[in-house]
A protein has these predicted regions:
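C-terminal edge-of-domain segments
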Residues: 179-186
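Intein-associated homing endonuclease modules of the LAGLIDADG/DOD-type, together
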Residues: 1-175, 207-251
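Long beta-strand-rich cores associated with HINT superfamily self-processing modules
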Residues: 5, 171, 187-209
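Helix N-cap motif at beta-to-alpha junctions
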Residues: 148-150, 186-189
């Protein structure tokens, strides 16, 4: 009827995994991916926010520096954080003007997170949301954004493993990198920070969070292709970062 979307695809509900162990605390990993410095591994947050979640970081605080116009920013360095990141993240090298070579971590969600337990995946997401996430005050909708498309698509996949449907919207910032913003609603609490958690609306309508609507079908032409065989009772499989449910239709 008009522009109404009336074709629905099933949505993955909490991906069942092997509960793989993670080489570091998943919440701290999420916090680093959000507000961590890729060379020094220091993490910068507002001081009041640190006071709210500091007990959730299981590593020993080595140094803290208070900065900012109103002394509102806290930069913290934790013992052992670099060594744990070495086990999970890829890296390149930064060459200083003096020729000194320093390891520079690449911010990506490691594959082991997707195979971790539900709680570990949720804790990693909470770290990302406490640092880079926001809440629409009027609607209570969650948002999170990055200037790196790889980290953005990684986050979409992480959300999908938790049964959360999200949308990705790129926005070109004048004189800066393109910003990729994801929006989603969920019944899950995705924040540890009190000021954000209190704003989240956790009773969205089921039709918004439990359904994926098919909005467009494009003809791709005729050509040779390989037959895909799926060995499970339902002949189903998951496609892309959003883990869209697809089924084998040709036997």
């Amino acid at each position: 009827r008009g522009n109404r979307k009336n074709h629905i695809l099933p949505l993955v509900q909490n991906l069942t995994t092997l509960n793989q162990e993670i080489a570091m605390d998943p919440y701290t990993l999420g916090v680093f991916l959000g507000d961590g410095a890729v060379i020094s591994t220091r993490i910068i947050m507002e001081t009041l926010d640190w006071n709210n979640i500091q007990n959730l970081i299981p590593y020993r605080l080595v140094k803290e520096t208070i900065t900012g116009k109103n002394m509102h920013l806290s930069t913290r360095r934790y013992q052992g954080l670099r060594e744990h990141l070495n086990l999970l993240l890829d890296y390149t090298y930064h060459i200083s003007p003096s020729g000194r070579r320093t390891k520079k971590f690449i911010k990506r969600i490691p594959n082991s997170i997707y195979m971790a337990s539900f709680q570990d995946r949720l804790n990693c997401l909470k770290g990302l949301m406490d640092t880079d996430g926001t809440v629409d005050k009027r609607r209570g909708r969650c948002e999170v954004g990055f200037s790196d498309i790889d980290l953005a698509t990684d986050t979409i996949k992480l959300l999908s493993t938790l049964g959360i449907k999200s949308s990705l919207r790129p926005k070109q910032i004048k004189g800066a990198k393109t910003h990729y913003r994801m929006q989603f609603n969920t019944h899950l609490s995705v924040f540890n920070l009190d000021r954000k958690r209190e704003l989240q609306h956790r009773s969205p309508k089921p039709e918004y969070v439990n359904r994926r609507y098919l909005s467009k079908i494009d003809e791709v032409g005729v050509g040779f292709c390989k037959k895909l065989t799926v060995q499970n009772d339902e002949a189903g499989y998951l496609v892309g970062h959003s883990l869209t449910v697809a089924k084998q239709t040709i036997t």
